[in-house]
Amino acid sequence: QPVMMTLPPIDGERYLDFLCRDNLRRDRILDWLGEPQMIYRHQELYADTAAEIALRENIPLIPVRQTFLRNHRLSQLIAADGIHLTMPGYEQLFDTLADWVKKNI
């Protein structure tokens, strides 16, 4: 049986800074995006859509995003590029997946 998971959140501001590190025109990217947090919101919509599909299709869902958002040190779990995880972030991801497997498999 398939299992779905939501993605860990990203930091839109840090990701935009990372994208613009090599003289990319931040102002032009923002003209297209509207604001830096649109990056975060697009990824949030992706996570919400995955959860809706899992519910509709009766597919088990691992709520990775929610466990990250509950962490009061979220910024320490996301790398400087704003999109990848740090080692503590990968540890939290592993723990979340392992806990889910223990409870559901």
Q: What name fits each language-model region?
A:
Residues 4-6:
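Structural beta-sheet core signal
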Residues 11-17, 69-75:
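Short acidic/His/Gly/Ser-rich catalytic and metal-binding motifs that mark active-site loops
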Residues 12-64:
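Substrate-gating cap/lid alpha-helix
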Residues 28-30, 73-78:
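A short small-residue
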